[in-house]
Amino acid sequence: MMLATFSTEVQTVIETIRTNLPYILMMAGVLYAMHIFNWFVGYRLNQYGIVPRRLRGLPGIIFSPLLHGDFNHLFFNSIPFVILACLLSLYGWPVFIYASVVIILLGGFATWLLARNGSHIGASALIMGYWSYLLVFAYYQPSWLSIVLAVVCIYYFGSFLLNVFPRSAKSSWEGHLFGLLAGLVAAYTSPYFSIAWSNFLASRA
């Protein structure tokens, strides 16, 4: 009986990934479309990344995940983005959107407030947030699914942790660090969001 239930749950996970993957790929497609346009205009859009402690850098909190330095930068971000976004979407689209908003806004604002001067761009901070969310959510809400997702993140993406340390002048390690920390906050607050969202839907019924 337990084996049959587990098999059914695994099949549900597989079907959910199949359903969600096209939408995740569309999001990745937006990144590529933005980058092609940015390349066409000589990467002028990169000035609209997060510029720390400058008012003109505040919009970059929203736009920086869409901007990349070159096609290699985008390619090596898009692969983990698709994988981790698919895994996170298994918790449902409301949770996915909530986590994404928290990571982008909180991680981006911390980068704007505390990072080095320059224009901080790239989706890697968002990716780091997804990674840390999937890791610690297994602690806050343990289940076979959350534990499996955490193990996958550790096994295949454990080296991500090195990204929070200064390794290259061109790499925004601050963005990686604050994205990771924002993911922790999103994971901790996510159960409260889920309760509030359920109550909201119930009140509209």
Give, region by region, the residue ranges found by the protein language model.
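A detector for small-residue-rich transmembrane helices and their helix-helix packing motifs
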Residues: 3-205
